[in-house]
Regions:
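Conserved acetyl-CoA-binding loop-helix of GNAT-fold acetyltransferases
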Residues: 123-139, 162-166
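Conserved GNAT acetyl-CoA-binding A-motif
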Residues: 138-160
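A short, internal acetyl-CoA/4′-phosphopantetheine-binding micro-motif in the GNAT/acyltransferase core
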Residues: 114-122, 150-155
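A short beta-loop-alpha structural element at the N-terminal edge
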Residues: 33-45
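Acetyl-CoA-dependent GNAT
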Residues: 65-120, 132, 198-201
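Short, positively charged and aromatic/hydrophobic N-terminal segments
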Residues: 7-12
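Conserved GNAT-fold acetyl-CoA-binding loop/helix
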Residues: 46, 50-73
Length: 228
């Protein structure tokens, strides 16, 4: 899958400044690059993910995986689904990917989406840009439903707020499931929500899902940009 390496898109930051953008360094380019992840990104992506494991309930994982294990996760996702990385000034600042929602054939038109942004760069539009490109690629694959599994709580605390639920609602997701006291971390119990966004038409003669490697060349341009 070496042909994934140099494919990217450029996202222009909006001229209208937000509070988060004001926190950006004055010399930082107002340009975001989103590209397909490489296995070599594992260490940088893990550096973003690890604090979510160690200090939040956003992920139910307890132990930080090794770089080699994380590299394997990237490789596994790219065998069938998109795994995207966001960069600011050449530095990775976030990532998003899709994975199988159900391992039975009838559920193949559904995916589970995941997104993580460097914690000191939230509010800059990174997550929205990643999700936007992810959704467009999934549509090309004939995926119909994007599902997000979100840790949530009745009482917000230092480990978890319900900001992710509000964010996904803003992106067009709707609540479809709620599980009570099903996650135990930091000696506390937390809930779990499933949110869904339909991105395609459900028909009787449904076109098959196309694996991500099969569409990569179709969405690329001469300079390696993704045509989305």
């Amino acid at each position: 899958m070496t042909f994934f390496t140099d494919m990217f898109i450029i996202v222009r930051m909006k001229n209208k400044r937000t509070g988060a953008e004001d926190r950006m360094n004055q010399n930082e380019k107002k340009e975001m690059k989103i590209r397909i992840a490489k296995e070599e990104d594992a260490e940088a992506l893990l550096a973003i993910y690890a604090p979510y494991i160690e200090h939040t309930v956003i992920t139910y994982e307890y132990d930080v995986p090794t770089v080699e294990e994380f590299r394997g996760r990237i490789r596994h996702v790219l065998e069938r689904y998109p795994y995207l990385v966001a960069e600011l000034n050449g530095e990775i600042c976030g990532y998003a990917y899709a994975s199988a929602f159900h391992d039975r054939p009838a559920g193949g038109w559904n995916v589970e989406t995941s997104i993580y942004v460097e914690q000191n760069k939230k509010g800059m539009g990174i997550g929205t840009a990643l999700y936007d490109k992810l959704e467009k690629i999934l549509k090309r694959q004939n995926i119909l439903n994007m599902n997000a599994c979100i840790a949530c709580t009745e009482i917000e605390d230092e480990y978890l707020t319900n900001a992710s639920i509000r964010y996904h609602e803003h992106l067009g997701y709707r609540m479809v499931g709620w599980f009570t006291n099903c996650g135990y971390k930091f000696h506390r119990w937390y809930n779990l929500a499933w949110m869904e966004k339909e991105i395609g038409e459900h028909v009787a003669d449904q076109p098959p899902v196309i694996a991500f490697p099969e569409i990569v060349r179709d969405i690329s341009l001469q300079n390696g940009e993704l045509r989305l």
